């Protein structure tokens, strides 16, 4: 009796070098894909003397120092393996260290690495032990005073209201990434389809975008790296000359907090880190999408498998849909990829058309007006929320009253339109005038705010639709 052998297997051959390297593979999924990725790498490394030996040394002795193992950088920075494109250091970190790795945002190079992916050199290091995985920082609890020493006359509410109502333009300012982002990032990535602007604050102040006025300042104008000021407050946000008041100048205005007389309120990660609602003009369409995966794709296609990592807008129907909306929906395409990594939220435009984002947290970090709408071109990504920044602002705000803390709820909502933008440079004044847009609610920060506000008790001035 003869066994039947597929014709393809007669001609398939795995080299001994590939077999050895696959011995260190992590996880048991996508065996064929991993084999092809390693085979592609071996062909490149065999052209370099000692490269294969160095890689095997790194994989067999992960605790020992090892040298860079490099391959040439492609034009777009990516590597294609079996009809899938990805960044090379991400691919090989996934093969040999972290099978669940989703994005380059989750990786940081070690100091010993001479050719990290972000260094714009002709060679890229793919040694998986020259990268570390970003850890989610532990946020310190917010200390809420047990006894209210709050003086409404010294509240920063006027400053927040100034930015939120009186000074907010009828049409938001616009900024385009990366042109308007003049502050150089601490660790910039090269321009590529997976280019991410993952800036962390380097200096105490950020430049305004070319279209942003120098005043009024954002109500959140504090350095991220500077510890919160002592409990000082000013009566108004600006002097008669229109310049922002230096909070450190009025050192005689002190809100006394008895030492140790406070309740700590801790941050907790919710089951669903965000929810996404889809709108067409001012009409809500479909059910709210609850995101449990840290990597979520929002696209214009249909997905009959009901993948929990995808929110497919192509499935949603609307009897009031006009031709402009229909045409816009056809251009959403691959849409936007949302990542929640290390306490930070990134939005990556994977559509062929730009996306437009309004995030107060992002605008604060870059010194823009709070209502600024940022254009993210195809192939670029932007950090749209930073938990550590939010934690610091919340810790500062609890000493200025209920209303000031409540204002931070606006930071926990991100609005994003597809294909069509809005603001001063567009004929659409408001996001509700754009054909297709989404509203993202960040559950962790919102629930943290809710717990802090509950501890603070009722506001001195009741919150209303006009407050």
Curated annotation (Swiss-Prot):
<dbReference type="GO" id="GO:0000978">
    <property type="term" value="F:RNA polymerase II cis-regulatory region sequence-specific DNA binding"/>
</dbReference>
<comment type="similarity">
    <text>Belongs to the dwarfin/SMAD family.</text>
</comment>
<feature type="domain" description="MH1">
    <location>
        <begin position="16"/>
        <end position="140"/>
    </location>
</feature>
<dbReference type="InterPro" id="IPR036578">
    <property type="entry name" value="SMAD_MH1_sf"/>
</dbReference>
<protein>
    <recommendedName>
        <fullName>Mothers against decapentaplegic homolog 9</fullName>
    </recommendedName>
</protein>
<dbReference type="InterPro" id="IPR013019">
    <property type="entry name" value="MAD_homology_MH1"/>
</dbReference>
<dbReference type="GO" id="GO:0009653">
    <property type="term" value="P:anatomical structure morphogenesis"/>
</dbReference>
<dbReference type="GO" id="GO:0005634">
    <property type="term" value="C:nucleus"/>
</dbReference>
<dbReference type="InterPro" id="IPR017855">
    <property type="entry name" value="SMAD-like_dom_sf"/>
</dbReference>
<dbReference type="GO" id="GO:0071773">
    <property type="term" value="P:cellular response to BMP stimulus"/>
</dbReference>
<dbReference type="InterPro" id="IPR003619">
    <property type="entry name" value="MAD_homology1_Dwarfin-type"/>
</dbReference>
<dbReference type="Pfam" id="PF03166">
    <property type="entry name" value="MH2"/>
</dbReference>
<dbReference type="GO" id="GO:0000785">
    <property type="term" value="C:chromatin"/>
</dbReference>
<feature type="compositionally biased region" description="Low complexity">
    <location>
        <begin position="205"/>
        <end position="220"/>
    </location>
</feature>
<keyword id="KW-0238">DNA-binding</keyword>
<keyword id="KW-0963">Cytoplasm</keyword>
<dbReference type="GO" id="GO:0048863">
    <property type="term" value="P:stem cell differentiation"/>
</dbReference>
<keyword id="KW-0479">Metal-binding</keyword>
<feature type="binding site">
    <location>
        <position position="130"/>
    </location>
    <ligand>
        <name>Zn(2+)</name>
    </ligand>
</feature>
<feature type="domain" description="MH2">
    <location>
        <begin position="273"/>
        <end position="467"/>
    </location>
</feature>
<dbReference type="GO" id="GO:0030509">
    <property type="term" value="P:BMP signaling pathway"/>
</dbReference>
<dbReference type="GO" id="GO:0006879">
    <property type="term" value="P:intracellular iron ion homeostasis"/>
</dbReference>
<dbReference type="InterPro" id="IPR008984">
    <property type="entry name" value="SMAD_FHA_dom_sf"/>
</dbReference>
<feature type="binding site">
    <location>
        <position position="113"/>
    </location>
    <ligand>
        <name>Zn(2+)</name>
    </ligand>
</feature>
<keyword id="KW-0539">Nucleus</keyword>
<keyword id="KW-0805">Transcription regulation</keyword>
<dbReference type="GO" id="GO:0005737">
    <property type="term" value="C:cytoplasm"/>
</dbReference>
<keyword id="KW-0862">Zinc</keyword>
<dbReference type="GO" id="GO:0071141">
    <property type="term" value="C:SMAD protein complex"/>
</dbReference>
<dbReference type="GO" id="GO:0006357">
    <property type="term" value="P:regulation of transcription by RNA polymerase II"/>
</dbReference>
<dbReference type="GO" id="GO:0000981">
    <property type="term" value="F:DNA-binding transcription factor activity, RNA polymerase II-specific"/>
</dbReference>
<feature type="binding site">
    <location>
        <position position="68"/>
    </location>
    <ligand>
        <name>Zn(2+)</name>
    </ligand>
</feature>
<keyword id="KW-0804">Transcription</keyword>
<dbReference type="GO" id="GO:0046872">
    <property type="term" value="F:metal ion binding"/>
</dbReference>
<keyword id="KW-0597">Phosphoprotein</keyword>
<dbReference type="GO" id="GO:0005829">
    <property type="term" value="C:cytosol"/>
</dbReference>
<dbReference type="InterPro" id="IPR013790">
    <property type="entry name" value="Dwarfin"/>
</dbReference>
<dbReference type="GO" id="GO:0070411">
    <property type="term" value="F:I-SMAD binding"/>
</dbReference>
<dbReference type="GO" id="GO:0071144">
    <property type="term" value="C:heteromeric SMAD protein complex"/>
</dbReference>
<feature type="region of interest" description="Disordered">
    <location>
        <begin position="174"/>
        <end position="246"/>
    </location>
</feature>
<dbReference type="InterPro" id="IPR001132">
    <property type="entry name" value="SMAD_dom_Dwarfin-type"/>
</dbReference>
<keyword id="KW-0225">Disease variant</keyword>
